[in-house]
Amino acid sequence: MQEAPAALPTEPGPSPVPAFLGKLWALVGDPGTDHLIRWSPSGTSFLVSDQSRFAKEVLPQYFKHSNMASFVRQLNMYGFRKVVSIEQGGLLRPERDHVEFQHPSFVRGREQLLERVRRKVPALRGDDSRWRPEDLSRLLGEVQALRGVQESTEARLQELRQQNEILWREVVTLRQSHSQQHRVIGKLIQCLFGPLQTGPSSTGAKRKLSLMLDEGSACSASAKFNACPVSGALLQDPYFIQSPLPETTLGLSPHRARGPIISDIPEDSPSPEGHRLSPSGGCRRVKGLALLKEEPASPGGDGEAGLALAPNECDFCVTAPPPLPVAVVQAILEGKGSYSPEGPRSVQQPEPRGPREVPDRGTLGLDRGNRSPESLLPPMLLRPAPETLEPVAPVDVLGPSLHGREWTLMDLDMELSLMQPLAPETDEAELTVKELNSSGVGKDHTLGTPLMLDVQADLEGAALSVPGALTLYNVTESNASYLDPGASPSSP
């Protein structure tokens, strides 16, 4: 106890060891305070038995305070660490527990190691001294560059958002325009094809073209049709001719001659009698014949010829073909060819066929004795023809009663035939075509023999009786039309 105070004056002397470490070395080694603070059995640490008594009794003797927390904080500043045993586990109260501190350079009996114990320098001060100005400037530049990139990215993102909104608006506008165009196209299609689908002849109706000859008259087509009513039964055959008006004439000039008029007649339209007239019915097939006859020229003008028909009963009307030139008539009489008037044909033209040989049916025997064709006719046929054509009953030609196929004069086989006088029958159609001879100089007026035209037709009902004409002969069944080479003339 007397040696400890002697050592105290030497501690504050000049030494590289800090004052706190010297006081702590003396405090731990003082035997008078072993009941409160002492070395551990291993000598590498010291123990504090009662912290409250140690703070009140021992600390004021060596230090200027009696605070145990300040003493522990100074120990931590010099690198001392608190040792916690496994038996305690840190669950007992600190007032009654033993507190143990240790440091690698604070060992019992080795005072020279105290020089290694240093006070901890704050790490922040050392780190601040390591930063250089160039590093700081570089760091600031990088931060500014990152901020610029971020701003440009945000601006680009905003621009993309605006463009996206514009594109969506355009898409909406295009959709509206597309729907409007779709509705307009639908209405156009309905307007164009609606009448075809809802009309009476829309369900698979095959429309055929009826070729009729325009005679140059000033009256309209409806007037021509209504002028001479036609019976629906007589139009079952595809070949029919409408009679011209009495006042109409045809010119022989090629510049004034007009072509045929094409008219549509539906095939499937119902008949006014309520039933469909079939060509294969009870009626028998007859052959109509036409006769060209010379007559004096009309006073209307030179070079014009009128074609007139004089039937007894106007069950169906006949349209006269264009005037035949004299050279053509002579060629037909000599058997060199057939006549086909020029004009617009139907859309689907038949394939051209080779020239047909005209069979030699003998001579008419008119060159002997200066005999005329009228002398060969029976007396019962030589009766005067009526002046005008009076229809029996008004029939709507353009109505749905016009069934069957069409007959064009261009498809008739014009051949020279033998004159065979026959008794008039109710099932025969007799046509008389009269051609006027021109009074001009240099023209041929010698038509001594009549021209026979083979007319193939399926006629039902009353027959047309042509007075003053001769029924020449019946054409054989093998004589088919040019419109359909492979089918019979009576086939629909």
UniProtKB/Swiss-Prot annotation:
Protein's UniProt keywords contain Ubl conjugation: yes
Post-translational modification: Phosphorylated mainly on serine residues. Phosphorylation on Ser-298 promotes sumoylation on Lys-293.
PTM sites of type Phosphoserine: S298
Location(s), subcellular: Nucleus
Tissue: Preferentially expressed in brain and lung. Also found in the eye. Slightly detected in liver and skeletal muscle. Isoform B is the major species in various tissues.
Stretch list, region Interactions with DUSP26, MAPK1 and MAPK2: 245-322
Cross-link (Glycyl lysine isopeptide (Lys-Gly) (interchain with G-Cter in SUMO)): K293
GO biological process, one term: negative regulation of transcription by RNA polymerase II
Domain of life: Eukaryota
GO molecular function, one term: RNA polymerase II cis-regulatory region sequence-specific DNA binding
DNA-binding region: 17-122
Pfam families referenced in this protein's UniProt entry, alphabetically: HSF_DNA-bind
Ranges where the record places region Hydrophobic repeat HR-A/B: 129-203
Chain residue ranges for the region called Hydrophobic repeat HR-C: 364-389
SUPFAM superfamilies noted in UniProt: Winged helix' DNA-binding domain
Keyword Iron belongs to the record: no
Keywords: Activator, DNA-binding, Isopeptide bond, Nucleus, Phosphoprotein, Repressor, Stress response, Transcription, Transcription regulation, Ubl conjugation
GO cellular component: chromatin; nuclear speck
Quaternary structure note: Homotrimer. Exhibits constitutive DNA binding and forms trimers even in the absence of stress. Interacts with ALKBH4, DUSP26, MAPK1, MAPK2, MAPK8 and MAP kinase p38.
Family: Belongs to the HSF family.
Stated name of the protein: Heat shock factor protein 4
Organism per entry: Mus musculus (Mouse)
Organism ancestry: Eukaryota, Metazoa, Chordata, Craniata, Vertebrata
